[in-house]
Amino acid sequence: KQRTVPRCFCCGSLQFPHHRPGLRRHRKNTTRSHAAVDRPRRTRRGDASPRPTGCGGERRAPAIPGGATSPHMSRRSGRGPVGDGREASRTAAEEKRRRKENYRQGPGFLLEKQHVGQDPDANGNHDDDDHAGQDAAHQCRIQ
């Protein structure tokens, strides 16, 4: 059986160990990993195929519409490269404030006024009135 020229598993290039220097000397690891076997070897015909993923640090853009296209986009620039950077006018402090406000409106955020029953007041007593923590109120009721 004639020996086939080893190709790169991820991009099918003939310079096989082109991304692992040192493999050219001793031909180890030329067997494809189990997962790579049922994946066809990528062939390169000009620019017809997208650049292969797998050789190194290419990052895929997240599949979020309107999301930042690159993980290295600066966070301050709003939504990454889309738009002309007008969204970037928000400063970090404003962002933070906005986030805090949104959190306050969210469910489960109780303002201090709304504590209802079973809430330990200043003495750690659990009691079932609406103003837990205001001891003056209890004193009035007791006397």
Curated annotation (Swiss-Prot):
| Region: Disordered, residue numbers | 13-143
For bias type Basic residues, the affected ranges are 17-31
Source domain of life is Viruses
Composition skew (Low complexity), residue ranges: 134-143
- Stretches with biased composition (Basic and acidic residues): 35-48, 84-96, 112-133
Q: What is this protein called?
A: Uncharacterized protein IRL9
